[in-house]
Amino acid sequence: MANTLPFEVVPARPRRPFVGWLTSAGGWLAVYGMASLWFVLFGAAMESYSELIGLLVFVALAPAVVGAFPWCIRLIAKGRRIRAPRALDLLLSDPRPPVLLLRSFQDDDLIDPSFPATSQTVPVRYESRLAAALRTLGPVIALGRPGEPEPELGAARLYVEDADWQDAVQYFMDRTAAVVAIVAESQGLWWEIEVAIQRVRSERLLLFFPFPAPAKVLGSFWRSAFLQDPLWGKWLRRKAVPGMEADRGERYQQFRARFSDSLKYPLPERLGRSRFVQFDRAGGPQLLPPRSPSLIVRLLTLNFRETLDVPFSRELRPFVAKVAAV
């Protein structure tokens, strides 16, 4: 497929596994080295002078450590992006039809506040876990944001000229195993969904309605980290649930208003607890039943109010099985 693309592909930065590994390793070394130096200086000050001086040194260095930590984590994430597979490489090496992921560029930083995403050092985004759950169908690809230095993790990025993006989307829709959209209010995304409704077999179409974190959380590393922290994040997530539920419901109602006339059958009035909408062969929309994390995960995390938790692989199992059988 990659050898016969009818549009111009913008060359992406080549995948460099060794450089990416070194970059991530540098981030980890910086984290542990900085923490070790902090405590060594604290201990040396206590031994050489007094406990008070040691405490003052500890407090004085704390802002520098707190300020540098996000940069270390970003370095780890950058290394992972450098060694992430590129879409063209996957299309050349994997004979299966791809899964096309549609989303608004504004949702590229949409973090996943659920378990097990909270156990990761680098903040995990919805896209990464969604792509992981769909890779059994084929390579998951998406058009990349123009000008981004490295591709985001999740769907492998393909870059095209601004004048060609619609042709690229339609080309892959005609050859895809499935089309999955992270729904948001975006004119470009709505055009893509409209085209998908017209060109893609309805049973291959899947819509995901995420829980959007507040803008002030997405714009701050530490707020994102605390929201995803396995311990403290549990309480913050419960506090954030009403607002995130309201934003998710608003996305769905905007989608209903925009696409009611484009679908053969009416959409449900509300999502309820469902996160995904799929379609049957006749085009009838169906809410995928929400699944809870496994009992083992809930016991290990003491998480018994799993409102925001999306166990992607478990929840998407019916859709994946249906598409695989088509």
Which residues does each predicted region cover?
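N-terminal topogenic membrane-targeting module
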Residues: A2-V10, F69-R157
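Hydrophobic alpha-helical transmembrane segments
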Residues: G26-G27, G33-A64
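Juxtamembrane interface helix immediately N-terminal to a transmembrane segment
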Residues: V9-V31
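C-terminal interaction surface of TIR/SEFIR-family domains
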Residues: W222-V326
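Donor nucleotide-activated moiety binding/catalytic core segment of transferases
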Residues: L158-V179
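Short, flexible/disordered intra-domain loops and linkers
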Residues: D109-V122, A156-Y159, V217-A225, R238-E245
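Short beta-alpha junction loops
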Residues: F105-Q106, P146-E148, E185, F208-G219
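Amphipathic helical hotspot of TIR/SEFIR-family domains
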Residues: E185-P214
